[in-house]
Amino acid sequence: MSQRTEHNGSWLRNAGSLLSVLACVAVLASPASATPASAAAAATPRTDDYLKRAERILKFTPLIDGHNDLPNFIRKTTKNQIYEGKIPFEDELPGHTDLKRLRKGRVGGQFWSVYTPCPDPPVPIDDPTWSVRDTLEQIDVTKRLIEKYSRDLQFCGDARCARRAFRRGKIASFLGIEGGHQIGNSLGDLRRVYELGVRYITVTHNCDNAFATAQSTVADGLPDTGLMKPFGIEFVKEMNRLGMLVDLSHVSANTMRDTLKVARAPVIFSHSSAYAVSNHLRNVPDDVLKEVAKNNGVVMVTFVSRFVNVENPDAADINTVVDHIFHIAKVAGWDHVGIGGDYDGTVYLPKGLEDVSKYPHLIARVLERGATTQQVRKLVGENILRVWTEVERIAKRLQKTELPNEAYWEGRNWTRPAKRDLNADFEGRSVPLFTSASNGDFCD
């Protein structure tokens, strides 16, 4: 073989090798032959996939939020006038809540707070205030709103109604009172508001009352005396007998502990988060979370920025709330965690949870963090419905053997001084018509 022929053969062999290498490179570069690593990446669910999964869950499981302050928003903005376009609920309201966003958020049930503020200090517990009147007005406006938008909302007074309303495509609507001051510290008024449809009472708001100590008192550096004895105990007992949910949001840590010792039915926290994650006194300590699990109750996680991130509220975001959900699930179990956003009760909300339309995004993040479909179903609604059903069952049993509780606060005044001398209306009588002790008993 000549030197030239030998050179040509060598070139052909080299060219063949090069073509083989290029062919391999082409095959490796083609989409059909992805590496195991790239295949795994392609199989990883995206955020959109979790959101679709969340939407599917909320299509078949009612999302029930424990606390929304829309009624107070209405009171402050329109003085409870809702007709003639004053509250265009079907359109976008300036707050966090309206019908359009509730539907977008897949809300299946809502506890509407018929909140009225604590009396300004230093009003004594038994001083006459307008709290009960204002509470009745808030019950009235909320029920009128539900009736006005009855195509979309349905008033409910029990857990079965909530499920029926959801199956009919309506948003089940319930009432909650935020503080014992709203019933005038009276067990008689407790029974009356139950008759009007209220189904939970927060034991205190940001003030002590005849029943218990508020967390705000402890925040001010005063002692945590817990549940007031004996009247606070009688209050809890009567709520259990009625079937009224006992709500421990806003109360002091010792009030939480004392109540859990005497409660005969599961309790709720309508809008509180985990103290171990953010050490704000509005949140629930781990020892209490464990007792809630024993009690078969539920803690409904709130979204308020300064509660979920006490050190840096501006940094609070949707993942911060997920942290609270998972902590409560870890300590108490997935059977004892729920959602209570506190929309329209605050102006400071985490990034990603700006209004009621954002619930599916929260559920998507919970799924992305590793929660199962069954765990999410418990979180969004099954837990609070289980608790409510159990409270109703226990109440029926207690009502067979117990009469309405006639206890009263030992510091209460049973008469009030008259504004004028009633005897002056009856001058000339030989015997005064009214004695000084009875002057305040007449309401002419």
Curated annotation (Swiss-Prot):
Disulfide bonds join 118-207. Zn(2+) 2 binds at residues 178, 250, 271. PROSITE patterns: RENAL_DIPEPTIDASE_1, RENAL_DIPEPTIDASE_2. It catalyses: an L-aminoacyl-L-amino acid + H2O = 2 an L-alpha-amino acid. It is an enzyme of class 3 (hydrolase). Keywords: Dipeptidase, Disulfide bond, Glycoprotein, Hydrolase, Metal-binding, Metalloprotease, Protease, Signal, Zinc. GO terms for molecular function: metal ion binding; metallodipeptidase activity. Its EC number is 3.4.13.19. Zn(2+) 1 binds at residues 67, 69, 178. GO terms for biological process: proteolysis. Glycans are attached at residue 413. Residues 1-34 form the signal peptide. Its cofactor is Zn(2+). Pfam families: Peptidase_M19. Substrate binds at residues 205, 282, 342. Hydrolyzes a wide range of dipeptides. Belongs to the metallo-dependent hydrolases superfamily. Peptidase M19 family. This is Putative dipeptidase CPSG_03667. It comes from Coccidioides posadasii (strain RMSCC 757 / Silveira) (Valley fever fungus). The lineage of its organism: Eukaryota, Fungi, Dikarya, Ascomycota, Pezizomycotina.
